Amino acid sequence: MPSRRAFVAGSIALAAFPAAAAKRLPPPKIGAIYWPGPGHDLHGFMAIPGKAQGPQPAVLVLAGASGADQFARGLADALAVAGFVTCLPKTPLSADEAIATLHWLATNRYATGKVAVVGVGEGSSLVGRLSAASDAQLSCGVIFGGATEAPASAVPILRLPAIGGGNDPAAYTASWEQAIAFLSEQLQPPRKH
């Protein structure tokens, strides 16, 4: 019997991939990466949309205590299929490490400079702290479950129920679609007049 995380990872793929499958989009390009942290290198995974031509908006995925497990990697891959350059640290980050990662993502050659953060499990508590940090270079955030109280935010934050917390595919799909629509809207380049 598959684990709950395997089920949720599969659900992410089912929620994110139908449109991709219909359009026959190429899968995301995924690789292990290192980037500069505060006094040491950080390690994780990067997923780049397979359809990407030029820089794309970026998303930092903050997972729970398990770090880059199967569930978190499925989430990062699904975000890349949705059109976002995605960074998933291998282990949970401190606030300073997360801010360094946001700075690195904002200036990464694959990214547009617009960066969001998505938190799941224990990683969701860091989203609120980052959204209040003036030096985070953050455009918006999405919290799936997790922390109920957060500091006053300087950027828009979308709070959604925990993903994978039940067996209601319709509710899960609705939350996923809300998150993708929110990220797409918030990470759009400024309109020229």
Annotate the PLM regions.
Residues 66-68:
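Serine-hydrolase catalytic-loop signature spanning alpha/beta hydrolases and amidase-signature enzymes
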Residues 88-97:
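Cap/lid segment of the alpha/beta-hydrolase catalytic domain
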Residues 55-64:
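Short beta-strand element of the alpha/beta-hydrolase
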Residues 22-51:
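N-terminal cap/lid segment of alpha/beta-hydrolase-fold proteins
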Residues 158-193:
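C-terminal catalytic histidine-bearing segment of alpha/beta-hydrolase fold enzymes
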Residues 103-153:
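Primarily recognizes the serine-hydrolase "nucleophile elbow" in alpha/beta-hydrolase
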